[in-house]
From Swiss-Prot:
Binding site for heme b b562: 75, 174
One example GO MF annotation: metal ion binding
Native source organism of the sequence: Dendroaspis polylepis polylepis (Black mamba)
Any matching Pfam family: Cytochrom_B_C
Protein name: Cytochrome b
């Protein structure tokens, strides 16, 4: 019997010996998901999905329910932590060429879309001022779809404006989608272990493998402990750090906030949407800002999998990270110069990464053959 079979029969999953800390974010995401479902369940017990009572029920949870403030703040901070981890997880995948495992990458992109939908529905539930107006603006984008747009929007709203039926169905969707995420995550993990995890070098991991437990399981536990400690620090000292002050006012359809914006983790997509003056064009760009990730496995041209030994592509990668942060920052600002120009330039750079990368792959291939 081979060593791998011995390890598997001993319930010890064989994993590459050189996988770094960047490989811990999958287990951190699973921890976030468990935390969100647990806190979400306790919040759902006390929440009322009614436009007249939703805002009051959230206040009731934080003030009157024993430990309700912990549940409510942990759920809000947990959502932010979920997105921090998933963005790092995606960046790691892009950097180390893990997208070449197509099934895992495409299932992961589908998971990201599901997660964004869940977070959006959840943001509407407190029925604060920013919740209401963000929901109005984002759902209104459906009207940009030719022919079907208006009918789709009315169907989603359950009426001719955002009202009680909208809140009820958003609550139902916010409750059911995490279970879809669990099943999709299971598929994602099964597909991953079909081939096994890759490593920072991009080489065949079968050459040198060690048991997952205790070597990598303790590393996972360390990162999970750091993440939970960080969340508890925010919860204890600055629970409103990630929240919008506007959302502490009850939703009022008659008063529009000076600057409508979603939660920080959607700001990069919202910034791309806002940078295009055309409604349909902006909606397409918003969708493509996520969907373009699906093109990565099909446009890889380099002989080398990882970016570790590709300085040109590395430069483009760090430009992408800087661009992502800049778009997020500009989306927090009002729609006026110079923020309009900055968001337009950064949006072009964001999409150009996925076009220039294959070209740089060819250039690097030529350079490597010349050196040989």
């Amino acid at each position: 019997m081979s060593n791998q079979h011995i390890l598997l029969t001993s319930n010890l999953l064989p994993v590459g010996s050189n996988i770094s800390t960047w490989w811990n974010f999958g287990s951190m995401l699973l921890t976030c998901l468990i935390l969100q479902i647990t806190t979400g369940f306790f919040l759902a017990i006390h929440y009322t999905a009614n436009i007249n009572l939703a805002f009051s029920s959230v206040i009731h949870i934080t003030r009157d329910v024993p430990h309700g403030w912990i549940m409510q703040n942990l759920h809000a901070i947990g959502a932010s932590m979920f997105f921090i981890c998933i963005y790092i997880h995606i960046a790691r995948g892009l950097y180390y060429g893990l997208y070449l495992n197509k099934e895992v990458w495409l299932s992961g992109t589908a998971l990201l879309i599901l997660l964004m939908a869940t977070a959006f529905f959840g943001y509407v539930l407190p029925w604060g001022q920013m919740s209401f107006w963000a929901a109005t603006v984002i759902t209104n984008l459906l009207t940009a779809i030719p022919y079907l747009g208006s009918a789709l929007t009315t169907w989603l709203w359950g009426g001719f404006s955002i009202n009680d039926p909208t809140l009820t169905r958003f609550f139902a969707l916010h409750f059911i989608l995490p279970f879809t995420i669990i099943s999709m995550s299971s598929i994602h993990i099964i597909l991953l272990h079909n081939e096994g995890s890759n490593n920072p070098l991009g080489t065949n991991p079968d050459i040198d493998k060690i048991p997952f437990h205790p070597y990598h399981s303790y590393k996972d536990m360390l990162m999970i402990t750091i993440m939970i400690t960080f969340m508890l620090l925010i919860l204890s000292f600055s629970p409103d750090l990630m929240n919008d002050p506007e959302n502490y006012s009850k939703a009022n359809p008659l008063i529009t906030p000076q600057h409508i914006k979603p939660e920080w983790y959607f700001l990069f997509a919202y910034g791309i949407l806002r940078s295009i003056p055309n409604k349909l064009g902006g909606t397409l760009a918003l969708f493509m800002s996520i969907a373009i990730l699906m093109t990565a496995p099909f446009t890889h041209t380099s002989y080398t999998r990882s970016m570790s030994f590709r300085p040109l592509t590395q430069t483009m990668f760090w430009i992408l990270i800087a661009t992502f942060i800049t778009i997020t920052w500009t989306a927090t600002k009002p729609v006026e110069p110079p923020f309009i120009s900055i968001s337009q330039v950064t949006s072009i750079i964001y999409f150009s990464f996925f076009i220039i990368n294959p070209l740089l792959g060819w250039v690097e291939n030529k350079l490597s053959t010349l050196n040989n």
